[in-house]
């Protein structure tokens, strides 16, 4: 499992065909990729790591606070292309990405785990498998990759 974590001033997701829109401010936009073979243990590891990453500045302007410490918001977006491989040719392959059934289940479990960790009122999410318009206004920028397996 792979999470691309971005500290943001604001973020949003719009799904025009679903008439769906969510927005956050001062927090994290997290793009989540699920790999073939991932399990609930991967969900727990990555979710806990992302909820406790100290990527927000303290009073000394040092990255020393977590999203929980700053009462930040998180926008979670499923992104199978995080496992895109472009080593051969010019068109990426996605054979490492989990099949939709597994990925959807683990994506929903990830959201559930983050809500338990941070509080559901601060968590927003995209819709698995939907074509989305994602708005990200980075803060820093600060971008961290969290993986459950090397």
Predicted regions and their residues:
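S-adenosyl-L-methionine-dependent methyltransferase catalytic core, i.e., the SAM/SAH-binding region
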Residues: 97
């Amino acid at each position: 499992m792979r999470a691309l974590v971005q500290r943001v001033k604001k973020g949003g997701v719009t799904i025009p065909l679903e008439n769906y829109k969510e927005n956050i401010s001062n927090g994290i936009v997290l793009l989540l990729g699920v790999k073939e073979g991932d399990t609930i243990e991967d969900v727990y590891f990555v979710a806990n790591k992302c909820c406790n990453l100290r990527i927000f500045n303290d009073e000394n302007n040092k990255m020393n606070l977590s999203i929980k410490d700053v009462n930040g918001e998180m926008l979670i977006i499923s992104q199978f292309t995080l496992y895109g491989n472009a080593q051969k040719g010019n068109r990426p392959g996605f054979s490492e990405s989990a099949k939709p059934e597994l990925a959807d289940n683990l994506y929903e479990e990830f959201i559930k785990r983050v809500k338990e960790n941070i509080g559901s009122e601060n968590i927003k999410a995209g819709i698995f498998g939907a074509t989305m318009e994602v708005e990200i206004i980075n803060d820093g920028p600060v971008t961290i990759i969290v993986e459950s397996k090397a």
